[in-house]
Amino acid sequence: AIDSSKAIAIIMKNPEFADVRSLEGASPTKHKAMPIIAVSTTSGTAAEVTINYVITDEEKNRKFVCADPHDIPVVAIIDPDMTASMPPKLCAATGMDALVHAI
């Protein structure tokens, strides 16, 4: 959900990128995104504190990465207790994702 909200927030201030696929890669946007308060419920990509986010293109059955320095949330709420209720497999998968990003 954080990734989707980052795309929406950037498009709201940069309507020329209304087709989210145009944001793939290093985004050439000119204006800062709408302010985002990100509440992370898993570990993983760190979209709540970085310029990166991943979007699913259901038409083409693929995912793509966007990177935009104008699209960093203004506040990130990270509560480790949120991960306590995750199923063990999801906890392991998102934890490994966070580890790989850190490396």
Label each PLM-derived region with a short phrase:
Residues 3-15:
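DPxDG-like acidic metal-binding loop motif
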Residues 1-6, 46-49:
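Short glycine/serine/threonine-rich phosphate/pyrophosphate-binding segments
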Residues 12-103:
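A glycine/threonine-rich phosphate-anchoring loop and its flanking beta-alpha core
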